């Protein structure tokens, strides 16, 4: 479950996280935050993963990887419009646990639009990734098709199209997707 710690976001979170089942991983979402800020949030909210949604460099990710506990995962986001040079990912391979591919838009996420997933055919890494960007119920057939490929898709990241309002998910829609995925396995 993602908690957005970027103050310019309509989904900005600065409250107390309610008690969650241990099976739900708490992910802090950051945009060009300092190492100090990320460390503070990891401690304050007992985060299990950090999602970097800004212009964080390989060096930044490498430093973060060295100073956070080993069990905390790093997810580096890359925004895609029509094309993408997957070669730039090579330098991030050893300093990130996952990649996340989102649609390039005005905001760093939550734009509600999809990118052309055909570009992922050029993904040659074995590094698992999250598929994101404007995924709603209307896209679930296409999601199910791409999940049948050999791509190392780790998870589907849903956001704006599953919200009642920014930061508040429609639980019924989330259940529908989870049940749909469960019965298709």
Language model features: what each stretch is:
Residues 1, 50, 99, 150-151, ...:
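Hydrophobic residues within beta-strands of alpha/beta enzymes
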Residues 1-3, 16:
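Short intrinsically disordered, low-complexity coil segments enriched in acidic
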Residues 5-12, 21-132, 136-139:
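Conserved anion-binding
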Residues 15, 68-69, 129, 146-151, 184-185:
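Alpha-helix termini
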Residues 16-20, 63-64, 144, 159-185:
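C-terminal helical cap(s) of enzyme catalytic domains, especially alpha/beta-barrels
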Residues 44, 126, 146, 180-183:
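Residues within well-ordered alpha-helical secondary structure of globular protein domains
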Residues 73-75, 130, 137, 141, ...:
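A generic "structured core" feature
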């Amino acid at each position: 479950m993602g908690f957005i710690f970027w103050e310019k976001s309509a989904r900005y979170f600065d409250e107390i996280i309610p008690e969650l089942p241990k099976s739900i991983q708490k992910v802090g979402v950051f945009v060009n935050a300092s190492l100090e800020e990320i460390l503070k949030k990891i401690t304050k909210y007992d985060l299990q993963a950090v999602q970097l949604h800004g212009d964080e460099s390989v060096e930044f990710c490498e430093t973060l990887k060295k100073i956070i506990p080993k069990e905390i995962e790093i997810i580096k986001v890359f925004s895609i419009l029509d094309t993408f040079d997957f070669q730039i990912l090579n330098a991030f391979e050893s300093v990130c646990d996952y990649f996340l591919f989102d649609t390039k838009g005005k905001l760093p996420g939550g734009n509600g639009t999809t990118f052309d997933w055909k570009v992922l055919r050029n993904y040659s890494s074995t590094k698992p990734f999250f598929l994101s960007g404007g995924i709603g119920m209307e896209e679930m057939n296409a999601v199910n098709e791409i999940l049948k490929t050999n791509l190392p898709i780790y998870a589907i990241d849903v956001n704006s199209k599953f919200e009642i309002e920014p930061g508040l998910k429609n639980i019924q829609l989330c259940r529908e997707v989870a049940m749909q995925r469960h019965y298709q396995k």
